[in-house]
């Protein structure tokens, strides 16, 4: 869940991903540059409930923290993904009730973005994430490397893509592996070996 201020600039956006098996499948998207943060939290909550009580990972940089807080404290949404400090490893997904050391979402730091971009790249290149939305495809086509990071080219958006970057990061977390019994990175490595063997 990527959150914007609702002032007509960046988009508040999210994708719903079916994670029951690989390849993962983008089954729904939302993108709006006019929705207010309070309304967006409610919309995310209603959508997650409709999609089988979906797990929700909110980017909590800046105004996104309000969406995470609302999902956690006002709606008491049980499938909100929490993160905690993992020492030198940065952040990790965790379960359980919120505490003083747990956040209702993830801050997009350099390590989170780097891991997320790498995982997303592998998922897309190996056809292990089916992207069904035209806006997402358009954003991916203008999401390029600049210096030591990836971002939208000037005049373009990357709000849906950043949600997928966070999904990529999440697939590499132990909690995600335990949740759906899929080790994404291992599966991607196996697929790479198969492709090399076929060549």
Where are these predicted regions, by residue range?
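RNase H-like, metal-dependent nuclease domains and their acidic two-metal-ion catalytic environment used
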Residues: 1-83, 114, 118, 122-199
